[in-house]
Amino acid sequence: MTKEKNQVSVLFMLFSILFCVCLITANVLETKQISVGKISLTGGLIVFPVSYIINDCVCEVWGYQKARLLIWVGFAMNFFFVALGALCDAIPGAPYWNNEAGFHAIFGLAPRIAAASFVAFLVGSFINAYVMSKMKLLDNGRHFSARAILSTVFGESADSLIFFPLALGGVVPALELPKLMLWQVVLKTGYEIIVLPLTIRIVGYLKRHEGEDVYDNGICYNVLKIFNL
């Protein structure tokens, strides 16, 4: 392998940074409830699906192993942000500062919700990357659009099935949880479909610029093999 091949791709680094920013931003936006018509959703819906689109692009161009590294880096940065926010929230505010309640609403995530969010993110993201990788091998690199959509459906479904029962079970009425989960999956998948033409162009550009189009033949899919690149 040449020295150039050992160098880290600048575009991969930029995608990694954007991925982490999306995850951290989604955490903050999740604290606001929004309405789309008559449907109540969390503000994280605005940006969180972008992380799945980035995951698709990375897995398609650089392969599952780079996507695995990206997911763990995103998880670590997100955890670091949440931990620092919780630490600052636990420190008493200055006597003259009147925004304690607002700060706590954003950074005082209940441990149950934070844990559910982290577990759901890891499971959903790895399923998304795994499905994307395996379908590319089965389709011999064809049908990117179908692979991107189906991997998102599987990933987002797993994310919702884990997050909502763990975080909101006993808080939201049992009959409402399935509706909430379904709408999250439908809208997040719809988000991906709407931006799919742009995603296709980005993937095409990345493959040409990077000279990469990785097929994951014979790799280890163990999610803990972080540095097995």
Q: Model segments located where?
A:
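Hydrophobic transmembrane alpha-helical segments of multi-pass transport and channel proteins
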Residues: 153, 157, 185-197
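Short, highly charged, low-complexity non-transmembrane loops/tails of multi-pass membrane proteins
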Residues: 203-229
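Hydrophobic transmembrane alpha-helices
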Residues: 1-75, 79
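Helix-boundary and loop/linker segments of multi-pass membrane transporters
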Residues: 5-8, 102-107, 137-142, 170-174
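A structural feature that tracks compact, well-ordered secondary-structure segments
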Residues: 152, 161-169
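Membrane-interface interhelical connector segments
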Residues: 88-112
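Transmembrane alpha-helix/helix-exit interface in multi-pass inner-membrane proteins
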Residues: 78-96, 117, 121, 125
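Internal alpha-helical transmembrane segments of multi-pass membrane proteins
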Residues: 138-157
